[in-house]
Design a protein with these regions (language model features):
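Primarily recognizes the serine-hydrolase "nucleophile elbow" in alpha/beta-hydrolase
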Residues: 177, 181-250
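Catalytic nucleophile-loop/oxyanion-hole region of alpha/beta-hydrolase
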Residues: 146-150, 166-194, 298-303
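N-terminal cap/lid segment of alpha/beta-hydrolase-fold proteins
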Residues: 52-129
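Short beta-strand element of the alpha/beta-hydrolase
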Residues: 131-140
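Short beta-strand/loop motif that positions the catalytic acidic residue
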Residues: 255-257, 261
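Conserved alpha/beta-hydrolase "acid-adjacent" motif
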Residues: 262-268
């Protein structure tokens, strides 16, 4: 009996050991490593040797438009609701993918001829191979590029949903030319980059929204690239801009803005989308009560979740289906609203219009 007891005890210890191993946390991948925290100095991120020369492009080259010593202290002119945790997440993502996250869109010969071209490029937030791509364009009044709040977070969230997203760093004085070059470069290198050449979207906030709308117009795309073989964007996603030009050649457009925006009037955006809708171009418009200019993803505000709405609009125009489930976590206590069959888990106060038809007001 003693021998049996010993064997049973040994078996129990073995099973307990196996159970303990099974409950051990998974090995953290490189992409999940914490290289930076809220207290990390911005200068340390920019000068991290892993980034090489392009580290200086992570934050605005035009230093007069931003302030702060650490990541949590970052402030950008004309922007509100900057999320320190998202800033840290973006920086850690870039550091984890430092070997392949930055792509030059101009050749070395071109940069030698025009040194200002060294202040350009795209940061690549990878999604699923051969999935559609988006180019995100930050605003900054055509004076600087506020990517850390107005394009990097958008690109990161899109990549989480399986889409390939590029955040463009452009020359403020030659923004349209640089976006045209980025579109051409990505389309020409689609196989190499592992992205679909068709069904892409252009995103932008403020000045970046003007860029997206302008290059989303097929006539402008052909004029600025000098080519007719490039496909037109399947959708343009715009935030807080006073852009008013309307054309039959414009892409389907999603737009959102805050009602307390002192720079870009929500009424101007609504009027433009109504004009596009009258031309038969698909549109979706949202205004958010009380929000000022430059709210970005709108985390913690009534606009939170707008990016998921915009993705669905893009899917509808491109004919694509969702690659991954939405990244937003829905709590049991959240109120669910429906907009034209679209479910939201955030309270959206304001005016919401799809193809010229008002859906609801909160």
């Amino acid at each position: 009996m003693s021998t049996v007891r010993v064997l049973l005890c040994m078996l129990g210890l073995c099973l307990q050991s196996c159970s303990s191993r099974a409950e051990e946390p998974p090995v953290v991948s490189e992409a999940m490593n914490t290289y930076y925290t809220r207290q990390s100095r911005i200068s340390d991120v920019m000068n991290d040797s892993a980034f090489g020369d392009y580290g200086r492009l992570i934050f605005p080259v035009n230093t007069g438009y931003w302030s702060g010593t650490t990541l949590e202290q970052l402030q950008l002119t004309w922007y509100n609701y900057i999320d320190p945790d998202k800033t840290v997440e973006v920086c850690n993502y870039l550091r984890a993918h430092a070997n392949n996250c930055f792509i030059d869109i101009y050749t070395e010969v071109e940069k030698q001829a025009n040194p200002n071209l060294r202040n350009t490029g795209v940061f690549f937030f990878r999604g699923n191979r051969n999935a559609p791509f988006a180019i995100c364009n930050a605003g900054g009044g055509f004076s600087y590029v506020g990517a850390m709040h107005d394009s990097f977070p958008h690109a990161l969230e899109l990549s989480k949903q399986g889409y390939n997203a590029f955040a463009l760093i452009y020359r403020p004085g030659d923004a349209y030319e640089d976006l045209a070059r980025a579109i051409a470069y990505i389309c020409d290198h689609a196989d190499e980059l592992g992205v679909s050449r068709t069904g892409y979207s252009l995103w932008g906030g403020s000045a970046g929204a003007r860029m997206a709308a302008t290059l989303g117009n097929s006539a402008n795309l052909h004029s600025l690239t000098g080519r007719t073989d490039l496909p037109q964007a399947s959708a343009v996603i715009m935030q807080y801009t006073g852009y008013t030009t309307v054309s039959q050649y414009d892409s389907p457009t999603y737009a959102c803005c805050g009602t307390s925006d002192g720079i870009a009037s929500w009424r101007t955006m609504q009027s433009r989308l109504e004009s596009l809708s009258a031309l038969g171009i698909p549109t979706e418009f949202h205004s958010y009560s009380g929000l000022p200019h430059g709210f970005g993803l709108g985390t913690g505000t009534v606009a939170e979740g707008w990016l998921d709405d915009a993705v669905r609009f893009w899917q509808q125009q491109s004919g694509a289906t969702a690659i991954c489930s939405a990244t937003a976590n829905t709590k049991q206590s959240d109120t669910i609203y429906s907009l034209n069959g679209i479910r939201r888990n955030t309270i959206q106060k304001g005016i919401n219009i799809v193809n010229g038809k008002k859906q609801y007001i909160k």
